[in-house]
Amino acid sequence: MEKNSKTLSFEFFPPKTASGLERLNNIAQAFEAVPAEYFSVTFGAGGSTQQGTLDTCSLLFDATKTPIAPHISGIGSDKEAILQSLNAYKDKGLKKLVVLRGDLPSGFGSIGDFPYAVNLIDFIIDEFENYFEIEVGSYPETHPEAVSPEQDLKYFCEKMSRDVEGAVTQFFYNPDVYFKFIENCEKLGCSKPITPGIMPIVNKDALFRMAKNCGAKLPNSLITKLDTYSKEDDVKKFGIEYVSSLVQE
């Protein structure tokens, strides 16, 4: 991915039912009309099974021509489990990964063999050399667990110094936050592509909950506007307009 090129990717959640998989398959094929660099597939938190991710990736790989990029998280996992997942992805012909630390669910015990994303990145490169193309995550508004924005930025740039393609950000709704983040990264010599992550607005309660959990700050103007809508269809319509404007900017 060229730094200044304009590309799209779409992120999917693994469905929990066969009918959900069929519906996702239809959606993904429709999305191929908008050429995407890749489709990414998320996974469960805290080292939970990644079988759903693999099943979804396999379906999309067979049904579409778009490259598929499974998310893989190190938190709560040991080397054997991660290696098993990586070999399964390689056997399927998948070459792109989104590598994350991941979040521990409440009450989870062991952090596993990979306390940070950079540990997992190093492990993947040691085991598979340059077979996988790696994207990483980033928090333009600072990771909720970070000691300070400065330390968070330092650790992010350390992660980007590895043999990775670039990064995808956590969602945000203030474009100035993203542009400032890019500027701060470049001051530290971190110049690989950082793709903005944009989440559709379809439900007010879900948006507020996810923003709180992820440390994403919602602009007051957005909150005020959302408060004027009581019907979900109206929220969705406004969300499409708002996010479309954000993407254009």
Language model: regions and residue ranges:
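Active-site pocket-lining/capping segments in soluble small-molecule metabolic enzymes
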Residues: S19, G112-Y139, L188-Q248
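Active-site-proximal loop/turn and secondary-structure-junction residues that shape catalytic pockets
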Residues: F12-K16, F43-G47, G74-G76, R101-P105, ...
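Catalytic cores of alpha/beta
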Residues: S77-K90, Q151-Y155, F179-E183, N203-R209, ...
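Active-site glycine-rich loop that binds ribose-phosphate moieties when present
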Residues: E145-V164, V177
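Hydrophobic faces of well-ordered beta-strands that scaffold small-molecule active sites
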Residues: K6-P14, F39-V41, I68-I72, L97-V99, ...
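Conserved N-terminal beta1-alpha1 strand-loop-helix module at the mouth
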Residues: M1-V41
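Active-site-adjacent beta->alpha loops and helix N-cap segments on the catalytic face
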Residues: S19-L21, G47-L60, D78-Q84, D103-I125, ...
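Active-site mouth loops of central-metabolism enzymes
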Residues: T7-R23, I68-E80, E133-Q151, D227-E241
